[in-house]
Amino acid sequence: MKQNIFKSIADLRFAIFILLVIAAFSVIGTVIEQDQSIETYKLNYPLTNRVFGFLSWDIILKFGLDHVYKTWWFITLILLFGISLLTCTLLQQFPSLKIARRCQFFRTTQQFCRLNISTNLKHLSFSQLLFKIKENNYSIFQQKNIIYCYKGLIGRIAPIIVHFSMIIILIGAIIGSLSGFKAQEIVPKTETFHIQNVLNNGQFTFIPKVSVRINDFWITYTKQTTITQFYSDLSILNIDGNEIDRQTIFVNSPAKYNGIDYYQTDWNIIGLRLRMQDSSIFQYPFINLPNTQEKLWLTWISTNQQLNDGLTILIDNLQGYCSVYNKVGKFIGNLELNESLKIENPITLIDILSSTGLQIKADPGILLIYLGFLFLMISTLISYITYSQIWIVQDKNKIFIGGNTTRATFEFELEFLKLIK
C-alpha cells in the first residue's frame, strides 16, 4: 500500500499536475495585487460589480488571494511538489544510475536486434577494435569473448542534479516566504530611523532592532538638468548609537548588512530654512503639487507680522536654488543657497531639506535559491554529455558489435562507423 502511494507521488504525471496547479495560482497572484490594504481591494473588486462575475474583495480575503505565496495551501503545494521530486529521485533516478553503472554484458547475438545500430564484422581483429574503442575514451569491461563499453556516465547524473536543485530552490522560496520581510521608509537627511513601516512579512519573520542614520542625500544632474542618479549616504548604528558600518547607495546598488538590503527608491523635498532680517531662523514645509508631469514643490512665506503679504517659493530640483514669486504671481528671481533676497525684509536661504525613500528587504532563503539555480545551470551543461554504450560479442570468426546513445544520435553513428572501418 505504502509502496503504491510513493510510486504515485514519484510519477512524472503527478509532478506535472502539481506544477501546473502551482503555476495557475502564481498567475492569480500576479494578476491580483498582493499585500495591499483592504480599501484597495474594496475599490478594485467591489461586491456590486464583480470581476469575471464572481471575484470580489470578500472572496479574495477569504481565500488569501491577497497574499497567495504565503498561504498554507500554496506552501503545501510547494512541499508536495518537492516530495514528488525527492521520491522520484530516490525511487527512479538513483536505481537508474545504479543500473547504468553495472556491466550489462550481452550473452547472445540475438540481443543486438534491439539496439539502435548494430552490425557484424569479419575483416577487423578483436584487439584492433578494442584499441579504437579505448582511443574514444570508453570504459571497457571484458568477460572472455564478450565486451561491454560505455562513456559519458556523468550525463546520467544530470536529472538527479535537476531534481536536487529544484528542491533547494523550493526550500529557499519557503524560507523566504515564511521569514522574509519588506519595509519602506521615507527619512529626512541627517535623521535616524528604525524599521517600522513593514509592508509584508511572513509568519516567522523577525524584524531586527537596527538603527540607520541618513548622513546625506544628493542628486546628480545632466547639463539639461535631468536626473542621472540619486544617492544616500547611510550609517548602520549599534544599540549605543555608534557607527558600525557606512555605505553609499544609489538606484540598483543597495547597501547590504547582516542579511538586510537597503535599496534607494525615491526622494522628496520636505522644506527649507530661511534667515530673516533679525537673524531669526524659520523652517517652512513644502507641499508636493499633484497631477504634474514633473516633481514640483511649493510653499508660502510671510514677509510681515500681519501675515497679509508674502512670497511663493517653487522648487523642482536639489541643485541649490528655488524660484521666488510675489503675491500676484510675478517672478522675482532665483534664490540660491546662502544668498539673500533683496526685498523690504531681506531673507537668506540657509538650507533645502530633503528626504530619501528607502526600501528595506530581507530574504533568508535567497542564497539557497541562487545555489539551486547554480546547480540547475551545472545540470544543463552536464546534460549535454552523451551517455553511449557499445556491446561486442565474438562468435567464432564473426564479431557482433552494436550500440546505443541517449542523445546526439548522428554523432554517435559517425563515431560507430569510424570504429568498424
UniProtKB/Swiss-Prot annotation:
GO cellular component: chloroplast thylakoid membrane
InterPro entries, per database record: Cyt_c_bgen_Ccs1/CcsB/ResB, ResB-like_domain
Membrane topology classification: Multi-pass membrane protein
Protein origin, superkingdom: Eukaryota
Entry's Gene Ontology BP terms: cytochrome complex assembly
Localization in the cell: Plastid, Chloroplast thylakoid membrane
Main location: plastid
TM helices/strands, residue ranges: 12-32, 71-91, 157-177
Record carries keyword Ribonucleoprotein: no
Keywords: Chloroplast, Cytochrome c-type biogenesis, Membrane, Plastid, Thylakoid, Transmembrane, Transmembrane helix
Keyword GTP-binding: no
Role summary: Required during biogenesis of c-type cytochromes (cytochrome c6 and cytochrome f) at the step of heme attachment.
Subunit structure, interactors included: May interact with CcsA.
Protein family according to the UniProt entry: Belongs to the Ccs1/CcsB family.
Protein's name according to its UniProt entry: Cytochrome c biogenesis protein Ccs1
Origin species: Thalassiosira pseudonana (Marine diatom)
Lineage: Eukaryota, Sar, Stramenopiles, Ochrophyta, Bacillariophyta
